[in-house]
Amino acid sequence: MGEYVQKGNIQVAKVLYDFVNEELLPNSGLDQDKFWSDFGALISDLTPRNKELLARRDEIQEKLNEWHKAHRGRFDFNEYKAFLTDIGYLEPEVEDFEITTDNVDDEIAVQAGPQLVVPLTNARYALNAANARWGSLYDALYGTDAISEEDGAERGSSYNPVRGAKVIAYGRQFLDEAVPLAQYSHKDAVQYAIVDGQLVVTTEGGATTGLKEPEKFVGFQGDPQHPTAVLLKNNGLHIEIQIDREHAVGKTDQAGVKDIVLEAAVTTIMDGEDSVAAVDAEDKVLVYRNLFGLVKGDLTATFEKNGKIMTRSLNPDRVYKTPDGGELVLPGRSLMFVRNVGHLMTNNAILHANGEEVHEGIMDAVITSLIMKHSLIGNTRYLNSRKGSIYIVKPKMHGSAEVAFANELFDRVEDMLGLERNTIKIGVMDEERRTSLNLKNCIYQVRDRIIFINTGFLDRTGDEIHTSMEAGPMLRKNEMKSSTWLQAYEKSNVAVGLAAGFRGRAQIGKGMWAMPDLMAEMLKQKGAQLKAGANTAWVPSPTAATLHALHYHQVNVSAVQSELANDRNDYRDDMLQIPVVDHPQWTAEEIQEELDNNCQSILGYVVRWIDQGIGCSKVPDIHNVGLMEDRATLRISSQILANWLHHGICTKEQVLETLKRMAKVVDEQNAGDPNYRPMAPNYDDSVAFQAACDLIFRGYEQPNGYTEPILHRRRQEAKAKFAAIQQ
């Protein structure tokens, strides 16, 4: 435990106290003593309600467990549904309504586009994500498997003109589809010019043409006769054709086009939750300081690449001339949301009555809002929100009472920081079963400030398993994706959001593409999320954001949502279909395969979390395919094994043998990392290995199947152990 400062009824870790006083409070318009006094009062007032809500979760889970035990082998759906209603799990639905959120930025309300999620503990990644508002299509195609390596088009270590030609052809095909010419093809273009406020394209034969829809031309840079950039707009997203006949690529292009740059990640969630490992005051200050640097606009990251020292910083805005001679300024950066933690965890950064740790979600709400306030009052290089709003994503809430508590918390924070009511907007993660089933009521509780709902398959599956742990053995992990409840959950989220008036006002988001190396497959599959009604979906990298942007040019999301707005189906009965296997017929080989896959996944993620404090990373799976892993993937993997153990599908000895065998595989996969600490053969001495064991063997008793309590405790243990070794 570090040093603390007493401020009224709370003790604040000195590292946090100094950061807030020296960096956040100056120029905030707030008095230091009053800030800490108000903070202490807020903690005292809201902590009892937070505890009540957590106790309610436990009470409901106990009732569910008892009911399933009593009805094992004689499950009746109508009885089950009546029981859920009796215990308040299924809430009486509110009357129809529409959300009334105002001062929402266009990136949320108007533009449909990709969304990045990035850990705030990594400044370089966070900067890359903020800058991913614009991305090179040529780089994204050339550097990934989106373009095949057949017929001499290998990536190689130096520029391959065969591959380059394929990239250019792909780019022209895209232009023909998104912004077609009135006659001819963009492939025929030898010059782009602006004449009398119109885009004029000259072809190989000397003919000229314009855009089929001239209004899609919105700006340019350089001389009208020889522009260096032509700005087009389709389905609300911008496309920039960059022209430079001296450039290595431009030289080879008959129109001098060196690149096609796409508006890509229009929004980014700067994450202080599932993708970070922040277990104490020092870790939390790193999260907050990086967020403050992003908001102020002065965050930088220095790193070595190919033997050169590189410095990353935020991109400036982009300035264009408009067709009528005016000026157009477009944001150079993604609109930032910040994800706070949920209601469960506490943190030792602040202690209150009897030395109790503060609920981390309460602390996050106050400090991240204080940070974002600086952007609203002109203390920053760039504006984040042009509408004067703060965007906070709130995860892992169960039912409408918990959402109402978040609303009360945000009310109190606004009053404390001198912000107008509903300045703080909320994004509600629909990732817990009790929220999915009562989503309309949840939205109603924040109808004046909601800007986002989002489905998250992984956390939601973890909760699905844990909620019905006593119902029987669950489907294998990969079979969950085609289960009845999951299909209904995805459809219901869209239907409820649209019925509540989200179209043109708020985001309806869908989940992560977890395979950052498999971009060709992403291009084939991820467009389906837009056809299902999403106006944003998660991507794992800036490159993936650029490629996913192509889908938004192919699909007019606003039109899709108009069609789906008539969907008044009630999906709740299908969502209540428990993914249990009544008479499992799995072979011994199939069971072992499931154990191998899940144990390897757990160990690969946990070893970096516990030993190195890395909360999100690309972890090779058992087939060496890199998968983006965070706490959500860990929750489902650990809960499926806890469920199978509980129902005798496998034994503890079998799981332990698998863990030890897979630890050797993970050790080999990490052999190139100089900071890596092997788990084998001294398993008892590896805090990371023991954490993985806890997550499985104690998975039944974890609150709602969450992994944070074990991870935090074991990470603190590892930090203390490594510090003692170094002394």
Curated annotation (Swiss-Prot):
GO terms for cellular component: cytosol. It is an enzyme of class 2 (transferase). Its cofactor is Mg(2+). The keyword Lyase does not apply. Glyoxylate binds at R339, E431, G456, F457, L458, D459. The active site is at R339 (proton acceptor), D630 (proton donor). Keywords: Cytoplasm, Glyoxylate bypass, Magnesium, Metal-binding, Oxidation, Transferase, Tricarboxylic acid cycle. It catalyses: glyoxylate + acetyl-CoA + H2O = (S)-malate + CoA + H(+). GO terms for molecular function: magnesium ion binding; malate synthase activity. Monomer. Belongs to the malate synthase family. GlcB subfamily. Involved in the glycolate utilization. Catalyzes the condensation and subsequent hydrolysis of acetyl-coenzyme A (acetyl-CoA) and glyoxylate to form malate and CoA. PANTHER family: MALATE SYNTHASE G. This is Malate synthase G. It comes from Geobacillus kaustophilus (strain HTA426).
